[in-house]
């Protein structure tokens, strides 16, 4: 039997640009993103919990450091030189994602999983892992990454 619990963070005001899009998503735009992480364990801890939500301050801080009022772009965005110039002038707080990740919510789910799941496994001695990451950019638009 598996036990699951979820934790939701947000809204986290985040901008991004999807330069490969042929439409308006190629422009810098943003949303108040909500993130929901699903934790899974075969055994509960000594308190009967899957995850101690009070022990997620570092996870919340990491997400906020990466996303809050920042603009996410892919590492192969052709406007990187101009965006870096704008950042130097104080007009943007740029976050160039690692190679292979893109700023849309689908890839953002995978990025969070890849970055945060090792943190969770370490803090729980491999007892807990993330099995689902969901992100909402609006009430109507949501994506998820499922392990």
Give the predicted meaning of each segment.
Residues 1-147:
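Charge-rich, low-complexity N-terminal segments
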């Amino acid at each position: 039997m598996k036990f699951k619990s979820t934790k939701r963070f947000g809204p986290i005001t985040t901008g991004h640009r999807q330069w490969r899009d042929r439409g308006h998503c190629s422009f810098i735009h943003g949303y108040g993103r909500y993130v929901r992480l699903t934790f899974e364990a075969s055994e509960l801890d000594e308190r009967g919990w899957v995850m101690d939500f009070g022990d997620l301050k570092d996870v919340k801080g990491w997400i906020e450091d990466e996303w809050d009022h920042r603009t996410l772009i892919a590492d192969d965005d052709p406007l990187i030189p101009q965006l870096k110039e704008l950042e130097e002038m104080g007009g943007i707080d740029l976050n160039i994602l690692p190679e292979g990740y893109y700023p849309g919510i689908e890839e953002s789910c995978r990025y969070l999983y890849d970055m945060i799941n090792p943190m969770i496994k370490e803090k729980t001695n491999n007892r807990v892992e993330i099995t689902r990451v969901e992100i909402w950019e609006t009430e109507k638009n949501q994506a998820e990454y499922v392990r």
